[in-house]
Amino acid sequence: MKLFDLQILKSLPYRGRFRGGYMFKGGIFKFIFRIIKLLLIIFFVGSILLVLLYRFVNPPITFLMIERGFERKAAGKDWKIDKQWMDFDDISDPMKRAAVAAEDQTFLENHGFDFSAIEKAIKKNEHSKKLIGGSTITQQTAKNVFLWPGRSFVRKGFEAWFTLLIDIFWSKKRTMEVYLNVIETGDGIYGVEAASQAYFHKSASKLNNYQAASLAVIFPSPLKWSVVRPTRFLRHRRYLIMRNMRRLGPLEF
């Protein structure tokens, strides 16, 4: 380009320069920004509608159930999703108390988050290679129903959002009902009714304190821990859960 041409170019207003260059790039950035903005709006509205839907409609399946099904197929096993929905009022009171005693003793008082537990988890994460959670029952329900399996800070962010929505739009009764019906309780087994039938050959409506605590004890790791063959560690954990159940007394939902 000649020096004369460069002088003419410099004299042009900024908006008139490189219509296929700078302005085109600016248009691309605006287009990308609009797409991101649209996706955020869709996620925001869609997530609210989905949480509202599941306030009245029972979740038919979860990402974890699907993943576990494929894992079984890859291992040469049959596809298995054993789940039997049970309404809140039909689940035995000991089972509800065992869940609270084992997983979230402030469940009826907190608003989806237990900040003291989160603070402890953050301190542990500073010295751990794995992400350690301080999850409430509401957070676990958000994770189990709406999110994919795994642990990452991104997923924790989504979990926090869905936890907030559940706390806003669901009652504690509905949260506990969904939690006890979708939680993994064994290899291909989900929910306390299917687990009760598999391990105790009885309905979850008839579980006593000991059986409910035996079931709640495996909630953190249902594929590694056994209800029927508990280790010494699990037996001690079951004792602690039963002690907490007595301390909690009847729960007022």
Each language-model region and where it sits:
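Juxtamembrane regions of bacterial inner-membrane/periplasmic proteins
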Residues: 3, 8, 24-253
